[in-house]
């Protein structure tokens, strides 16, 4: 007589549980599942739940040594996607104990690990995650958050202005610092290292940090405003990254920057902890996000990457523009912008928000609009993003025919004009162009 029946059995017998009541401590996921032809959606949904939690392809002897009921992921809901053939939203609940505390890395290894290569699925996309309060409380989150940043910078009641220094590659450190100075002197709050600028032969990081710090102090002295430059600390190893952050702090720089997807969540969380301990703000760039989030039916939606970043830690994150050169729909973008900034966000499917998310006093992140925007977009941007945002004009500053400083002046003047017009109750959508024309006289 055998102890148990080996062999392959349907996942749905164990992992499809439509009657399950979700717990407040569960991590909930909404997956867009495209099963292979002939695979029923229940089986596909259950397969996702199994493969991203306790399951393997057969019953194993060691299952008897643990409580599956306590540790298994469960597919508790399925709905067909309107307008798509053979696509379903599968809702999966994961018990909290499956995840290491304070580790975005571990959360993703489970939820979006092997399961994405699964044979029974043609494609799989993680659309949203509900992160329970009990798990959020194990994370530090953003080093400082929106309010503390405003207090540090002494800038209130308007979006902040930035500019990426171009040409992104090829300038010497001295000329790079000069461009930084001109932009800050003209009226921007921040300038930015491009995400590709790390420490290349034509400009080593230490030289760049030095000349940028000089530019910041000079511009501060002349304008009486606090200025910053996002010093990109991204590096090939975590140790080197922290070394760069330490040097930035020694120079008295207010903010450093990290590419969180190429750098990885482990490195990012380390840097975020360092930044909080040492009073540095942290600007996050999302290079590589489109590799993960651009396909509609496979990968994961950017709102998930944004939530993960808020847990891992960052004070600014690039979030699309709605109007510039890169893709992004307005309502959907505003959905994850709110997920970054607000304390509590209600479920709202029209904005792509599948779950109500409570952030319980985890600091907020400023969304950064960047990529192909310029001064004529200013009315739309102030209206769409509101005060709590950073508007970044790279070519839209440095492309000014009179040079960098006048480009910076133009952006600052346009911003102040739009904010004032809005505060006076004028309709930015309708009168935007007129407001800008008046301002530039």
Swiss-Prot record:
Residues with the modification N6,N6,N6-trimethyllysine, per the entry, are 5
* GO cellular component assignments: chloroplast
Give yes or no: UniProt keyword Oxidoreductase: yes
Keywords assigned: Calvin cycle, Carbon dioxide fixation, Chloroplast, Disulfide bond, Lyase, Magnesium, Metal-binding, Methylation, Monooxygenase, Oxidoreductase, Photorespiration, Photosynthesis, Plastid
**What does the record say about PTM?**
The disulfide bond which can form in the large chain dimeric partners within the hexadecamer appears to be associated with oxidative stress and protein turnover.
Report the cofactors: Mg(2+)
Q: Where in the cell is it found?
A: Plastid, Chloroplast
- The answer, when asked if Transcription regulation is one of the entry's keywords, is no
Q: Which PROSITE patterns match?
A: RUBISCO_LARGE
In this chain, where does the modification N6-carboxylysine occur? Answer: 192
Instruction: Extract one GO molecular function annotation from the record.
Output: ribulose-bisphosphate carboxylase activity
Q: Where is this site: Transition state stabilizer?
A: 325
Could you tell me which Pfam families the record lists for this protein? Answer: RuBisCO_large, RuBisCO_large_N
Note accompanying the cofactor annotation = Binds 1 Mg(2+) ion per subunit.
Q: Where does substrate bind?
A: 114, 164, 168, 286, 318, 370
Q: Mind telling me which InterPro entries this protein's record contains?
A: RuBisCO, RuBisCo_large_chain_AS, RuBisCO_lsu_C, RuBisCO_lsu_C_sf, RuBisCO_lsu_fd_N, RuBisCO_lsu_N_sf, RuBisCO_lsuI
Binding-site list for Mg(2+):
192, 194-195
User: According to the UniProt entry, what is the EC number of this protein?
Assistant: 4.1.1.39
| Catalytic activity, as annotated | 2 (2R)-3-phosphoglycerate + 2 H(+) = D-ribulose 1,5-bisphosphate + CO2 + H2O; D-ribulose 1,5-bisphosphate + O2 = 2-phosphoglycolate + (2R)-3-phosphoglycerate + 2 H(+)
HAMAP family under this entry?
Answer: RuBisCO_L_type1
Biological function:
RuBisCO catalyzes two reactions: the carboxylation of D-ribulose 1,5-bisphosphate, the primary event in carbon dioxide fixation, as well as the oxidative fragmentation of the pentose substrate in the photorespiration process. Both reactions occur simultaneously and in competition at the same active site.
The protein's assembly and partners: Heterohexadecamer of 8 large chains and 8 small chains; disulfide-linked. The disulfide link is formed within the large subunit homodimers.
PANTHER family registered for this protein in UniProt: RIBULOSE BISPHOSPHATE CARBOXYLASE, RIBULOSE BISPHOSPHATE CARBOXYLASE LARGE CHAIN
Which protein, by its recorded name, is this? Ribulose bisphosphate carboxylase large chain
Origin species? Glycyrrhiza echinata
| Upper lineage | Eukaryota, Viridiplantae, Streptophyta, Embryophyta, Tracheophyta
Q: Which gene encodes it?
A: rbcL
């Amino acid at each position: 007589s055998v102890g148990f029946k080996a062999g392959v059995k349907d996942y749905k017998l164990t992992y499809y549980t439509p009657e399950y009541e979700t717990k407040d401590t569960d991590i909930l996921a909404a997956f867009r599942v495209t099963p292979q032809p002939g695979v029923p959606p229940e089986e596909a949904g259950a397969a996702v739940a199994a493969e991203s939690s306790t399951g393997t392809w057969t019953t194993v002897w060691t299952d008897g040594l643990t409580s599956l009921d306590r540790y298994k992921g469960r597919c508790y809901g399925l709905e067909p996607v309107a307008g798509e053939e053979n696509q379903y939203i599968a809702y999966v609940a994961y018990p909290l104990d499956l995840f290491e505390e304070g580790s975005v890395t571990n959360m993703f290894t489970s939820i979006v690990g092997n399961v994405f290569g699964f044979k029974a699925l043609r494609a799989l996309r993680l659309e949203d995650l509900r992160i329970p309060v009990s798990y959020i409380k194990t994370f530090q989150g953003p080093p400082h958050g929106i309010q503390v940043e405003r207090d540090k910078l002494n800038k209130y009641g308007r979006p902040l202005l930035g500019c990426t220094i171009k040409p992104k590659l090829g300038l010497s450190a001295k000329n790079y610092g000069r461009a930084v100075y001109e932009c800050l002197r003209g009226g921007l709050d921040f300038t930015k290292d491009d995400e590709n600028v790390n420490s290349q032969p034509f400009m080593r990081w230490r030289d760049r940090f030095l000349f940028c710090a000089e530019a910041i102090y000079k511009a501060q002295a002349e304008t009486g405003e606090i200025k910053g430059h996002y010093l990109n600390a991204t590096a090939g190893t975590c140790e080197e990254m922290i070394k760069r952050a330490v040097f930035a702090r020694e120079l008295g720089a207010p903010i450093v920057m990290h590419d969180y997807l190429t750098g990885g969540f482990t490195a990012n969380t380390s840097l975020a902890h360092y930044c909080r301990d040492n009073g540095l703000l942290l600007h996050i760039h999302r290079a590589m996000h489109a590799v993960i989030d651009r396909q509609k039916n496979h990968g994961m939606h950017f709102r998930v990457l944004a939530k993960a970043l808020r847990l891992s830690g960052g004070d600014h994150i690039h979030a699309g523009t709605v109007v510039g050169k890169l893709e992004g729909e307005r309502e959907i973008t505003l959905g994850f912008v709110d997920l970054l900034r607000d304390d509590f966000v209600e479920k709202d499917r029209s904005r792509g928000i599948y779950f109500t998310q409570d952030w319980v006093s985890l600091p907020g992140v400023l969304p950064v609009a960047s990529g192909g925007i310029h001064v004529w977009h200013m009315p739309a941007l102030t209206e769409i993003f509101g005060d709590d945002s950073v508007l970044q004009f790279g070519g839209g500053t440095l492309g000014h025919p009179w040079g960098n400083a006048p480009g910076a002046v133009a952006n600052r003047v346009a911003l102040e004009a739009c904010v004032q017009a809005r505060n006076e109750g004028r309709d930015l959508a309708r009168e935007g162009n007129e407001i800008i024309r008046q301002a530039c006289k």
